C-alpha cells in the first residue's frame, strides 16, 4: 500500500479560535494573522492505494464550490480546486477514487466533493465511481438537520 498526503484548498480562520487560550503573542510567530485576525490553514486529504484493491480518499477538504462572495466570507484562499490539482500531481483523477471516507459532513471536510463554482451552474458531485463512507449519526444529522 502507498499513502499520499494530498493538499486541498486552504482557508483563513480566526487565529484566536484555532489556538484557544494560547496568547496571540505566541501563535502569531508561527502563523501571522491578517487584518481580520485570520490565519491560513492547509486542508489535507490522505490517499491510500491499494486498500483491498481499492483507491481510498480520506477527507475532501473545503474545495472550491463557493461563489466568490462566500469564498471571501469563509476565507477560502484559492479559486481553483486544489484537491483535484493535487490528485492529478499524484497520478490520479477524481474518477479513479473508489471510496471516499469522511469524518463528518461539515463543508470544510466535504466541500471538496463538489466541482468548482461556475456562474449559473448547478452544484455537481465529483468522484462518480466512489462509494462514500460517513458515520450513521453524521448522515442522519445531515438528512434531518
Predicted regions: what is each one?
Residues 2, 8-90:
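Conserved beta-strand hairpin/beta-sheet module of binuclear metal-dependent hydrolase folds
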Residues 55, 61-145:
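Active-site HxH/HxHxD metal-binding segment of metal-dependent hydrolases
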Amino acid at each position: 500500500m502507498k499513502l499520499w498526503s494530498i493538499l486541498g484548498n486552504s482557508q483563513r480562520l480566526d487565529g484566536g479560535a484555532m489556538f484557544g487560550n494560547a496568547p496571540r503573542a505566541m501563535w502569531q510567530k508561527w502563523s501571522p494573522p491578517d487584518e481580520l485576525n485570520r490565519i491560513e490553514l492547509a486542508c489535507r486529504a490522505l490517499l491510500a492505494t491499494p486498500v483491498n484493491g481499492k483507491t481510498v480518499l480520506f477527507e475532501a477538504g473545503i474545495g472550491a464550490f463557493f461563489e466568490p462572495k462566500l469564498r471571501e466570507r469563509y476565507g477560502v484562499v484559492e479559486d481553483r480546486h486544489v484537491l483535484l490539482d493535487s490528485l492529478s500531481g499524484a497520478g490520479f483523477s477524481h474518477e479513479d477514487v473508489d471510496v471516499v471516507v469522511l469524518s463528518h459532513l461539515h463543508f470544510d471536510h466535504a466541500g471538496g466533493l463538489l466541482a468548482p463554482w461556475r456562474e449559473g451552474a448547478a452544484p455537481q458531485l465529483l468522484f462518480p465511481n466512489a462509494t462514500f463512507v460517513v458515520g450513521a449519526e453524521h448522515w442522519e444529522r445531515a438528512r434531518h438537520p
